């Protein structure tokens, strides 16, 4: 009997149904329990996994590496200096070669087209560890964290504040719409998500009943939120836009005043961040921003980051469990005839 997931790639959330995404979230929670209990789950024994990184990473690389090892697979890291995608060798040729040697491929880089071509030509499952457009592996971890905290996904209100046209905003909007989560993007008009992404989300919301909102009004956007979510103000490759972004996004910083505007501080409220976070001056970027712009915190204050509302480290750990679920489901020959 065919498995729902076997042999499939995870390139963008919109390629998966609500039931499939819910299954991956629940399977992630199950594998986390096995890990905590010390129960082996070597579903990928003898498999070899290529980890392709055009963009640097702490969490994604660590999560894929430990997840692969826990599953009994051997991960092989190939950094930007090790791969020639489109430079000295076409993506197609690279994909064919890697597909003949590895059983699965993770890609973290810039172009969505590259990860799609890897999947098209390699003949093995390919997992998108982040592109400029989508971040699907992060989504399974994020909604896993939401479900662990609230016991459900449907009807939860998640508000993303910050740069509304980056990959995190895209993925949260579309994935939430698929899962029946009410998603609001609260951002300056200049940084609203693209019409293409909004239209994807609207179509999914019609089916799931999710309520969507795109607004530049902070008070309106965050009122009644269960989850406040933010990300760095400047994405990788956009470092020249620091000044522009700092000036645009200052009003969208997650701070205690914003939490009060949710009118839910005494209820069910958590704060998520995919990390790294610029919540103090203990980084080179933090020092530079403090020196140039006179602010010691960017997208989230240190007070909120370290408060009882912060779930960012729980969320980061869940990257490993969710990536494990994704790889096991798509490569592990598991009996999943339906979801």
Swiss-Prot record:
One of its GO terms (biological process) is citrulline biosynthetic process. One of its GO terms (molecular function) is ornithine carbamoyltransferase activity. The keyword Transferase applies. Its main location: cytoplasm. PROSITE patterns: CARBAMOYLTRANSFERASE. Keywords: Arginine metabolism, Cytoplasm, Transferase. The keyword Zinc-finger does not apply. One of its GO terms (cellular component) is cytoplasm. It is found in: Cytoplasm. L-ornithine binds at residues 167, 231, 235-236. PANTHER family: ORNITHINE CARBAMOYLTRANSFERASE, CATABOLIC (PTHR45753:SF1), ORNITHINE CARBAMOYLTRANSFERASE, MITOCHONDRIAL (PTHR45753). Reversibly catalyzes the transfer of the carbamoyl group from carbamoyl phosphate (CP) to the N(epsilon) atom of ornithine (ORN) to produce L-citrulline. This is Ornithine carbamoyltransferase, catabolic. It comes from Enterococcus faecalis (strain ATCC 700802 / V583).
